[in-house]
Regions:
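Short loop/turn segments immediately following beta-strands, especially the blade-tip
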Residues: 1-2, 50-59, 116-123
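Structural motif
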Residues: 43-51, 103-112
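Disordered, acidic Ser/Thr/Pro-rich linker "stalks" and the adjacent N-terminal cap
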Residues: 138-181
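A contiguous binding-surface segment within folded domains or other stable secondary-structure elements
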Residues: 37-41, 45-74
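Structural WD40 beta-propeller signal
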Residues: 26-28, 85-87, 118
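Surface loop/turn signatures of beta-propeller and other carbohydrate-active proteins
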Residues: 1-24, 59-83, 125-144, 151
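Hydrophobic core segments of beta-strands in well-ordered, beta-rich domains
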Residues: 21-40, 91-100
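Repeat-solenoid scaffold signature
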Residues: 70-110
Length: 181
């Protein structure tokens, strides 16, 4: 169900210092949150980190709870290069870039995940079940209550058949929980 990437094969192959991208700032209560994407745009562990400040003009401090958004398993992975917004019901959301990489290594899909801020002001992106269809709540909701989404995977590795298939496109790949197969 979870993809693994052997990053050790990449050690020593890059000489340039990576740069963060996709910076985004939001304000919640009296705190500013600067979010940006880390290197790894062609991997399912593409993610965002967050820095906090009391001023929009600076003094941002990287947070020990980083990454603030990460989704390495499930149907589709990656949760980087994001933007965060608040809807009319006061629910926070993150729109993010999810990695596919089938037809091109930079192939993407858009993801939408609920965001919350705990009582200490720590920002959290809730990626669990975020790659399943969901009905957008028409009221304020608790993003930690995963039953609010109404979906649970029932087909993982279930028996599947087809009258015909091409090599590499066998019917069992329809239920393997991987967008790249």
């Amino acid at each position: 169900m979870y993809d693994e990437i052997d990053a050790s094969a990449w050690l020593g192959k890059f000489s340039k210092v990576p740069c963060p991208e996709g910076a985004w700032i939001v304000k919640n209560k009296n705190k500013y949150y600067l979010q940006y994407a880390t290197p790894g745009t062609i991997c399912n562990w593409y993610c965002d980190v967050v820095l906090e400040s009391d001023s929009v003009n600076g003094g941002f401090v990287e947070q020990p709870y980083n990454p603030v958004s990460l989704k390495v398993g499930g149907f589709i992975g990656g949760a980087g290069h994001s933007c965060v917004f608040k809807d009319k019901y006061e629910n926070w959301w993150q729109v993010t870039s999810m990695w596919v990489g089938n037809h091109d290594e930079f192939e993407r899909r858009i993801g939408l995940f609920p965001v919350s801020f705990d009582d200490k002001g720590r920002m959290r992106t809730h990626t669990v079940l975020g790659d399943y269809p969901m009905s957008l709540p028409q009221k304020k909701f608790n993003p930690q209550d995963i039953s609010a989404f109404g979906w649970m995977l029932q087909s993982y590795h279930k028996k599947s058949t087809a009258s015909s298939s091409l090599p590499g496109f066998e019917p069992e790949k329809a239920v393997d929980e991987n967008v790249r197969t």
